[in-house]
């Protein structure tokens, strides 16, 4: 045979009209006349690279054939039901003949879903258990990544920096098969507005087919890419007009009561973005910080500092409404101990602790009385992936509903026992009170059993209000938005292109946080992971389509020395979710990753200082030393 030429880039795929799914379009108004009538106009291209998940524990699974023609799979997966369906399909079995169990994962970030299906085939053929553990090099070569994107934009704006029209094409490298690409592209379209009201838009999404691995879900799921391009456009507008970037941002923010509808038709009802940005400014005094950097840059000939902020508005829910559901199973034993099972999976994000906290709160018992059992398709079926930052929202509410049902039954037993109305029964501090009389939770559990009252319940939750029209790309895809803001300071060596993050200040809207310690860890971790995507993590494919950066020696994730010496993460205070989420909390897994765009913008700011902030550099992501140095030379050349 003769090898065919490989299609490896987005540009090649577009030229050959090679796509894994049909183009997507989101529009509002007529963009061509709006662009033509705009006082100012810019057009250009931007590229951002992919990113490997680099979970500490690689892909690993164990498949064991059963004695009745069934299959048991223990897997490191975020989506047990997807593995169940995949195995059943490959083996020609009904779903009830395949059980998938997940105790925990050593990280995932979107990269662990369906890979375990192959070992079930091997186990089925061999009629004996088969275990798979991919070495790091094989894992990186065989699995999908964050989608690289090519953006082409044409924006019209007025003299104040107000965007009047935007024609934007977002082309994603989907790889060899569709995988998650269509959904990632949809979410990118839904976040290409970020915090800004865009009166006239045409967003076009292209899912490009190339001869690389099929790219897949990754923390943020298209949101980071969508936000990256609009922030770049905002910066270029500011430089062209000689305005401060933050001033242009504020002039384009969504407002309360007007200019509050997204390009996909959802009203931004919970808008607190200006409040979050103001809180960041009050906390760190951005004006004084910027003056300090100006003084440094005037004195330093080689090293230049940059400062940039990044506001975020990130939608929470799966774009596909059917996925926004969850189940949970709660058992109370006669000694007062509790077992909880739900459809979410634990990958180090603290989901099991948060859901256990919910049940502990309902019963008013200590957390150590609750055991969360391994996620299993045989216990809670038909689950959605633990993804889209919705794990706590969905599974926490399902567990709440199950625990509430049991609590109501137990309260009825207690009311009968104390001869008082059920409304007078109070659960508090591991005890049940009726006035000045009380019994322990375990005593009530035993009494309920004696009274033949069920101490088990299944809970279910479906996210309300959401709907989405895939044909028109309109509706309410998100239950609510999570907001945040960041400011980052970097130093750039203009002789080598090397950069260093010196300080980062982060504020994240977590609603009424279920667990501030966990949430702060998520904020910091997501930020550093986002830094890696935008600065050091570069995927490089050779001319034959072989990945050459397939290990820590060639693929550079951030290390401990890359973390800013000053990194302050804060949870926005006194900001409960206006929607009826679990205890009015908000999701935290994905949104903080986009705060790291402040680092990339700060690098651009440092380069722009070479032109007295009158020009925006041509800089793609990741901002490797080579790219930064090229951008520096390009800016210097334009100034000359």
Model-predicted regions and their roles:
Residues 135-137, 368-381, 542-562, 619-621:
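Substrate-binding beta-hairpin/strand module that engages nucleic acids
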Residues 221, 386, 390, 578-591:
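Amphipathic, heptad-repeat alpha-helical segments used for oligomerization and assembly
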Residues 368-374, 558-585:
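Generic long, charged, amphipathic alpha-helical segments
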